[in-house]
Amino acid sequence: MTTDNQTEYVAALTDLHRGLDRKGPGDSDFSLKILSNLSILPLKRRIADLGCGSGASALLLAQYYQSPVMAVDSSSVFIDELKTRAKQLGLEHLIIPIHGDMAKLDWSVGSVDLLWSEGAAYNLGFEQALKIWRPLVSNNGIAVISEMSWFTNELPEPAVAYWQNAYPMMGNEFENIVRANRSGFKVLSTHRLPSQVWWLNYYEPLRERIEQLEISPSSQSVIRETEEEMKLFEKFSNFYGYTFYVLQAV
């Protein structure tokens, strides 16, 4: 893919997700269960959401902890949506929107007590993301990272073929635990995002959005790939999905 084509593709993908509450699968109740089981953070806690999209998790974290959240995303469109949503919820004083590259943060070592990232680590590769982010997390600090993961060792060929092309570094949960350990984290727990919330909170709103879009050559390609992804998940959601890895910096 040429640079121009890549730029057009990213623009079309951004436009497809414009206005959606979530830019990927997730669920507030599911996240709250994880948060309720985390160890107590310092009184002056430092929280970051990397790859925040339009802020579904950042806003939840701000509400839950009543603490500032540094929310980072490379899309200015999504950052603008986050600012609007924060204002609507009366949380603008707690949200620190940062338009930037989550792989090139110039933050001090140990400057984050809770690092949260949903559906974004794959952009760097799970292990690479953890190695880049580990220095940011304080000693014994917590990271909660969701990562596309295989759930079983016996895998259907169509799913393998699709993901070898879409995300060749995708591993199973055991492999990802090993990767986390190699990156300076202890794995405290893992939690699989239920397949039904993929549909309820992400795929169904995405389908409605597709019906509203004006079709262009670049959007046509993105829509075709998105529909292929949805069909695959409909058939094989027992075999893969997002696992949330709750990690402690060691």
Residue ranges and their predicted role:
Residues 24-43:
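Conserved alpha-helix/loop element of class I SAM-dependent methyltransferases that forms part
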Residues 48, 54-104:
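Class I SAM-dependent methyltransferase SAM/SAH-binding core
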Residues 169-184:
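Short alpha-helix
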Residues 191-250:
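Conserved Class I S-adenosyl-L-methionine
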Residues 105-114:
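A short acidic, Gly/Pro-enriched loop at the edge of an enzyme's catalytic core
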